[in-house]
Amino acid sequence: VEVKDIEKLITDAIELDEIHVAFDGSQCKIIAVADFLGDLSRVKKQQTIYAPLTQVINDGLIHAVSIKTFTTSVWQREKMFNLPL
């Protein structure tokens, strides 16, 4: 699995304004940016981003996932502290 594959799995399932993915062969770090995420609980945000990855995680292609979510306005303030992954 490559970064572009992970990005595609997520963006095919969810409409995001931005996505940033880092993957080292086992651990995946994801930053997802979309305004609708602001309406969800912390758990629901994680579940929303995690769900499209369930199959590759179950297949053992990804062993650990770290997810950070932001609305677009919060991302404008926070991106300097969160990039690069």
What is the predicted role of each segment?
Residues 1-85:
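N-terminal, polar/charged subdomain of small-to-medium soluble alpha/beta proteins
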